[in-house]
Amino acid sequence: VYPLATMARGAAGIEVPARDLGHDLAAMLAAITAATRVVFVANPNNPTGTWIGGAAMEEFVANVPREVVVVLDEAYDEYLAPSDRSRSISWIARYPNLIVSRTFSKAYGLAALRVGYGVMDASVADLLNRVRQPFNVNSLAQAAAIAARGDATYVEESARWNREGMRQIEAGLAKLGVAFVPSHGNFLLVNVGDGARVYAALLRDGVIVRPVANYGLPAFLRVTVGLPAENERFLAALGRALGSPRANA
């Protein structure tokens, strides 16, 4: 989405290669030039699920020039353990060039409403208000988001179901002998060898996953954690797609 947003504004983007399927913060800092205006960082990252702790992330933000805006996309933050969840909003007082982006589409379960929010310095908010689209999020979506924001019990239950589903899929992949990237989100990046072939086989079996060749990961598929029966269906279909003798075990 970041390249698309960049191109839509007529800007030129610089993609910094990943390191160990995660962000290379040192390389990102080195890639900043006098022409750089915005840096996007997703944490936890999509589609790899890798995560950078708060101390390292704040150090990165502190080293970005003040005239460059840092957009910290924390769409999957609620899936982290409570002790690991980001405190980046408290950094804005020290780094007025920081925008923290959150969404209600993941742990809050409001994906169909397409609503999220950004927290930033008032001066940055004023600039965004001048250029944003004239039609804002509809009033029903706003009301739902406000109600969801106050329902901490639901969010914690959502995170718990996700942790249990993650363990279920990880155990199933281990039985199939399939490698995956440990994830801090609500999905797993799974190494199936030939992503396009296995994606097509799963689709024929009625299971939809996400191919990620466009991220430079043609051997992988991204699999969202579902309910227990959905996870089992995926694992069985994956076993069939891979021709595993354990698929029907």
Region locations from a protein language model:
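PLP-dependent aminotransferase class I/II
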Residues: 97-181
